[in-house]
Regions:
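Short, low-complexity N-terminal leaders and the immediately following helix N-cap/first helix
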Residues: 1-69, 122
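Short, glycine/charged-enriched hinge/interface segments at domain edges or termini
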Residues: 2, 59-223
Length: 225
């Protein structure tokens, strides 16, 4: 019987009526999720930061002791670095040399930057007034455990992936890609690899053009020839 042509508007209406919303999802690795659409709301698995830590390089001390004792020189009793905490409880007159991102040892609540301190052997003097909790980052300052990171239906971008990684999410649920089949019909069509055309033949333009047009991370393409 062959294929009967129909009016464009009727064809468009028929296609729209046959569309079924795509709800299937899949769980994929975080580093594969760029330009995918989240199928679930995603929350943080941890507090970020997980512990109170230093926002600067400098010296940590107890603000109350500093306020009550003018010109006090603190005894420096250790060093705290990111990933290498000082597991010691500091006394009131003690300080710790501390670096950005390092966990705050127990017994201190304030950080003075290096340039605001005078170090002499195992002593340090704080040059300027500092308020309690200055230059420290409290637990959960960036994200609290259970806080929203990505909404359902969000197109995931590179900053989203960074935020998801920081919040302890190694996998994400996303909608499966839309599937498109491309078929180019016509007895006169030949592939561009053919070097010599026969009478009546033309090179197939639509197929390679459409395959290229839809070649992206949003779609799964089926080449039907």
């Amino acid at each position: 019987m062959g294929i009967k042509p129909i009016q464009l508007e009727i064809a468009k209406k028929t296609l729209l009526n046959d569309i079924v919303p795509k709800t299937n999802n899949e769980n994929i690795l975080l580093d594969q999720s760029i330009i995918r659409i989240s199928s679930d709301t995603i929350t943080s698995n941890i507090n970020l930061p997980s512990t109170a830590n230093s926002a600067v390089d400098g010296y940590g001390f107890l603000a109350k002791t500093f306020h009550e004792n003018n010109n006090l020189e603190f005894e420096v009793v250790g060093i705290a670095k990111a990933g290498h905490p000082l597991n010691k409880v500091l006394k009131n007159n003690q300080a710790v040399e501390i670096y950005t991102g390092a966990k705050m040892p127990e017994g201190i609540d304030t950080i003075a930057m290096h340039e605001n301190c005078i170090r002499t052997e195992n002593k340090v003097k704080i040059k300027h007034y500092h308020v309690k909790n200055q230059n420290m980052r409290p637990i959960g300052e960036n994200l609290r455990k259970g806080e929203l990171v990505i909404k359902k239906g969000k197109l995931i971008n590179a900053p989203d992936i960074g935020q998801l990684a920081a919040s302890g999410n190694s996998h994400v649920n996303v909608y499966k890609k839309l599937k498109i089949s491309i078929i180019s019909t016509g007895d006169e069509l030949v592939d561009s690899s053919v070097t010599k055309l026969k009478d009546g033949e033309i090179y197939d333009v639509n197929r390679p053009m459409l395959l290229s047009l839809f070649d992206n991370k949003y779609l799964e393409i089926e080449d039907q020839g």
